[in-house]
Amino acid sequence: TASVLLLVALIAVGMNITYALFSPTKLEKPGKCPKNPPRSIGTCVELCSGDQSCPNIQKCCSNGCGHVCKSPVF
């Protein structure tokens, strides 16, 4: 079962990377991503693949390891 979960996770990451590289439009929303706290590392998972994949005004930001949707700073 661990092998199956690892395989599914790798496929999901591969699909996200492929989508991010080959998506037809890259919408960048206004504002900047908030700075991560010093010496912090977030969850190593890709929960977004660009600002267009985040709801409302949120941006796709690095969390120190992966990417997550966060409210921007202006």
Swiss-Prot record:
Disulfide bridge positions per record: none
SMART domains: WAP (SM00217)
Cell compartments where the protein resides: Secreted
Cell membrane found in the keyword field: no
Entry GO terms, CC: extracellular space
GO BP field: antibacterial humoral response; innate immune response
Keywords, comma-separated and alphabetical: Protease inhibitor, Secreted, Signal
Keyword Flavoprotein: no
InterPro entries: Elafin-like_sf (IPR036645), WAP_dom (IPR008197), WAP_four-disulfide_core (IPR050514)
Main localization of the protein described in the UniProt heading: secreted
Signal peptide extent: 1-23
Tissue: Spleen, kidney, brain, liver, lung and cell line Rat-2.
Record's function text: Involved in the metastatic potential of adenocarcinomas in rat. Could have proteinase inhibiting capacity.
Name of this protein: WAP four-disulfide core domain protein 18
Source organism of this protein record: Rattus norvegicus
Taxon lineage: Eukaryota, Metazoa, Chordata, Craniata, Vertebrata
Originating gene: Wfdc18
